């Protein structure tokens, strides 16, 4: 299905599929997916922060976090098959691809096939997940970013999945309150992981307070700010 390409004011090229229901029917030879949008921007966080990245946002989520910045992706979405999603992504130039949501692993079989095809095409693929769906059966050359839900989110993650993360994966704690910081510290110290650990303040919170906490507790984690939000990118 053709994508609606437009130029964003910040200068990035965006190929966006609007959220909502679509009438397109998947081809018989390829599994169907619910896609909220496909666009290109700078990766704002994680291991590849700052790199131009193709984002494939899947529709549908099993959580309802209090600070969710993409609530429209919880439902709806355009019906596309895996081959069409790959074709849409490959119209974009960046080497990195981030499959996000929503919760991508609610469409795990299709996501696994999508990742395999993108990797075969020479892309580096990461998947962002809320840590409620097991991912140990995904292709090993995918980089996983697990978002552990802290108390202020109003939701939860399966922290036992932290042991399944590899050294090429990452784990993120989105924090805004003292309770969040204390919870993150407790999980970090009680659930060892091979993954890189990030502490990510909710946009607009007191960043210095969070930095001071990380320093005072000598946490084995990297503080990260959401780069894309500071420079006005999606």
Curated annotation (Swiss-Prot):
Broad EC category: lyase
Cofactor note: Binds 1 [4Fe-4S] cluster. The cluster is coordinated with 3 cysteines and an exchangeable S-adenosyl-L-methionine.
Pfam families (UniProt xref): Fer4_12, Radical_SAM
Involved pathway(s): Purine metabolism; 7-cyano-7-deazaguanine biosynthesis
Residues holding Mg(2+): 70
Domain Radical SAM core residues, every copy: 48-234
Binding-site list for substrate: 42-44, 57, 100, 234
Catalytic activity: 6-carboxy-5,6,7,8-tetrahydropterin + H(+) = 7-carboxy-7-deazaguanine + NH4(+)
Annotated region described as Disordered, given as residue ranges: 1-28
InterPro entries linked to this entry: 7-CO-7-deazaguanine_synth-like (IPR024924), Aldolase_TIM (IPR013785), rSAM (IPR007197)
PANTHER family given in the database record: 7-CARBOXY-7-DEAZAGUANINE SYNTHASE
Role summary: Catalyzes the complex heterocyclic radical-mediated conversion of 6-carboxy-5,6,7,8-tetrahydropterin (CPH4) to 7-carboxy-7-deazaguanine (CDG), a step common to the biosynthetic pathways of all 7-deazapurine-containing compounds.
Assembly description: Homodimer.
Record-stated family: Belongs to the radical SAM superfamily. 7-carboxy-7-deazaguanine synthase family.
Designated name of the protein: 7-carboxy-7-deazaguanine synthase
Species this chain originates from: Methanospirillum hungatei JF-1 (strain ATCC 27890 / DSM 864 / NBRC 100397 / JF-1)
Lineage, opening ranks: Archaea, Methanobacteriati, Methanobacteriota, Stenosarchaea group, Methanomicrobia
Gene name of the record: queE
């Amino acid at each position: 299905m053709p994508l609606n390409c437009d130029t964003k004011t910040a200068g990035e090229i965006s190929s966006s599929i609007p959220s909502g229901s679509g009438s397109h029917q998947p081809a018989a030879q390829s599994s169907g997916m619910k896609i909220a949008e496909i666009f290109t921007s700078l990766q704002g966080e994680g291991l590849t922060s700052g790199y131009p990245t193709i984002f494939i946002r899947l529709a549908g989520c099993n959580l309802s976090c209090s600070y969710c910045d993409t609530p429209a992706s919880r439902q709806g979405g355009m019906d596309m098959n895996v081959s069409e999603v790959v074709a849409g992504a490959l119209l974009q130039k960046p080497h990195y691809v981030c499959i996000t949501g929503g919760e991508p692993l609610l469409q795990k079989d299709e996501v696994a096939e999508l990742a395999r095809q993108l990797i075969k095409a020479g892309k580096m693929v990461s998947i962002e997940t809320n840590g409620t769906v097991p991912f140990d059966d995904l292709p090993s050359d995918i980089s996983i970013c697990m978002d552990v839900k802290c108390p202020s989110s109003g939701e939860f993650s399966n922290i036992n999945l932290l042991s399944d993360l590899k050294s090429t994966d990452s784990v993120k704690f989105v924090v805004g309150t003292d309770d969040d910081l204390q919870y993150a510290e407790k999980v970090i110290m009680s659930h060892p992981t091979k993954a890189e650990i990030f502490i990510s303040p909710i946009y607009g919170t007191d960043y210095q307070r969070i930095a001071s906490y990380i320093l005072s507790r000598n946490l084995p984690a990297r503080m990260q700010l959401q780069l894309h939000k500071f420079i006005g990118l999606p």
